[in-house]
């Protein structure tokens, strides 16, 4: 919290100046996601004038992709899940979103090989399968966006608001794989 306070002072803002508080909910580091969400909950409890906006790391990568590529049929977002696995979510040009999945590298490669149309691939997990898909002519690969940038999230939220699209305000982590502690107990 001291870091947040320092940034607010530096920007000459108070919490009363804020309309929205945006936070990412994952998937990602279990501890990092939990700390971010807990901090957001604390601020939102203290300041009722602020509205919560939750953006997944999939949505973040998807938004970065559509700002770079306009002609596509589907966008595949791959996030590194480690242990030779990826988190994957597919966004269709029509607006349909498939449910996020935990997959292995082979599944991703086979699925992309069978795809037709113009397919965009992006996300931190793309590097794990890149050498296996780089020669597929229907695949457009975008560089991974190593860090989530606050300004991109703000731009995404502004875009959503301008289109009257309902924003996610559920301050809850996006779990696709159970936390290690849970798997150990089971």
Swiss-Prot record:
SUPFAM superfamilies: Actin-like ATPase domain. It comes from the Bacteria. One of its GO terms (biological process) is tRNA threonylcarbamoyladenosine modification. InterPro entries: ATPase_NBD (IPR043129), Gcp-like_dom (IPR000905), T6A_TsaB (IPR022496). This is Uncharacterized protein RP551. It comes from Rickettsia prowazekii (strain Madrid E).
